[in-house]
Amino acid sequence: MTKRAEAKYKIDRRMGQNIWGRSKSPVNRREYGPGQHGQRRKGKLSDFGTQLKAKQKLKGYYGNISEKQFRKYYAEAIRMKGDSGDNLIGLLERRLDAVVYRAKFVPTVFASRQFINHGHIKVNGRRVNIASYQVRVGDVIEVKEASRQLTLVLEASQLAERDVPEYYDVDHGKMSAKVTRIPLPNEVPYPVIMEPNLVIEFYSR
């Protein structure tokens, strides 16, 4: 197991929020961070601290993306036309692992990454095993026919704790999803408030 995969159990506690809306989140059981000093009262964050936390939360939500890769998303977001914060969310939501997770083909974004790496996903009829692959509007994502009866897939499609966003056209009978448009941040079903503009400010210092 990679360090990033192991860290998923600590992300909620470090942020002090249930960022995926999971019923088994450790935040539901205690309100302090991980480690022996987790119960210390935290002081007011500086502007830098607030920006850093916003970055860590967004990066963690999408599977604890590496700093190098996340910085590349920032660089691309500021090069694009329009609001850089909106652009950043659009890029993250077009990651293949995010799409597979949003379509409810798997229960978590971490499971999505592993599912893709193991070759269970096709994009426009071709197998893609790169979790960071950028999906485009109109692309059709599907679970390979041989993988559609996996318990992981069948259980995920029935999850009641989250709904499929309106910017996807999903058919769980065929285990396929089509990206209909790029969402704005306020359309993305985050269980907690995300602040992409603070992330842009962090990297723009």
Curated annotation (Swiss-Prot):
Residues 20-46 are annotated as: Disordered. Residues 94-157 form the S4 RNA-binding domain. GO terms for molecular function: rRNA binding; structural constituent of ribosome. Disulfide bonds: none annotated. The keyword RNA-binding applies. It comes from the Bacteria. GO terms for biological process: ribosomal small subunit biogenesis; translation. InterPro entries: Ribosomal_uS4 (IPR022801), Ribosomal_uS4_bac-type (IPR005709), Ribosomal_uS4_CS (IPR018079), Ribosomal_uS4_N (IPR001912), S4_RNA-bd (IPR002942), S4_RNA-bd_sf (IPR036986). Keywords: Ribonucleoprotein, Ribosomal protein, RNA-binding, rRNA-binding. GO terms for cellular component: small ribosomal subunit. Part of the 30S ribosomal subunit. Contacts protein S5. The interaction surface between S4 and S5 is involved in control of translational fidelity. One of the primary rRNA binding proteins, it binds directly to 16S rRNA where it nucleates assembly of the body of the 30S subunit. Belongs to the universal ribosomal protein uS4 family. This is Small ribosomal subunit protein uS4. It comes from Beijerinckia indica subsp. indica (strain ATCC 9039 / DSM 1715 / NCIMB 8712). The lineage of its organism: Bacteria, Pseudomonadati, Pseudomonadota, Alphaproteobacteria, Hyphomicrobiales.
